[in-house]
């Protein structure tokens, strides 16, 4: 498997990040929705997918790695956020965010987020 690419040329996708938020609907009742926070360039690297059995049905899941430049905005992302690829509309449930270069000269430049499609967001 090829090593992941880093750099401006490798950031081929526009990723929109949203945070879960509670707002009042037109009747004053609390309603949970997504609040868009920011959009950044990023890369999507697919990993080996799998199928899980949920309630006696197969559910296809595709894990991916989202790579983005580290910034004050991207440092805020946690596991209760979601990412959406702007062009296709594919939604990703974020599982974790890490710095892949801890202990190297590129430490602090990039974030890799393990995420999944095909699961509830």
Residue ranges and their predicted role:
Residues 29-121:
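Short, conserved turn/kink motifs that form compact alpha/beta structural patches or helix kinks used as
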Residues 1-30:
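Active-site-proximal polar cores
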